[in-house]
């Protein structure tokens, strides 16, 4: 089978309900970086229990006004900006390794737990829901999870019983508005939808790994 036929066959197997992101230079540069230390997006395992239980790399600490994010080229956590006003991140925030979403980034996760976690650390989390978000016209959904090793939170399997705390998460909309950015947060979706979204992002990542190896 020719390379063109192989590409066409792979495209035919993609889910038609969601558009696939283009394999851009930002992704390719991080995929090709193998000369230095481990890259948290590509080298850390997602975990054997995924999509239900999975590893999360923490980018932003609970209670922080500093927005950190992964530098995709180096694999380091960099400072992006400091939030406006008194808005802080209500929970630890990070991403799931070896996943890929339509915005060309790994899947975002908010992790509910008792303590703040240092940026660059990773932990085990369990999906309990999904927060649909539109950020400046683009889909930017967030997985809502609990720390699987926190005795205060690990028994939760659905977001319904955590609704009061989840309202804090919707304040993410506030900090965007303070920066004159249009963002909309819809009603929380159940854990089954979250697991489906994670599985889709895992499949999309695997597809692009294969594609990058052909180039």
UniProtKB/Swiss-Prot annotation:
Tissue specificity field: Expressed in metabolically active tissue such as root, shoot, embryo and aleurone.
GO cellular component terms listed in the entry, alphabetical order: cytosol
EC code: 3.6.1.1
Compositional bias per record (Low complexity), positions renumbered to this chain: 1-21
Region described as Disordered: spans on this chain: 1-24
GO molecular-function terms, A-Z: inorganic diphosphate phosphatase activity; magnesium ion binding
Subcellular compartments: Cytoplasm
InterPro entries the record matches: Pyrophosphatase, Pyrophosphatase_sf
Cofactors: Mg(2+)
Descriptive protein name: Soluble inorganic pyrophosphatase
Originating species: Hordeum vulgare subsp. vulgare (Domesticated barley)
Taxonomic placement: Eukaryota, Viridiplantae, Streptophyta, Embryophyta, Tracheophyta
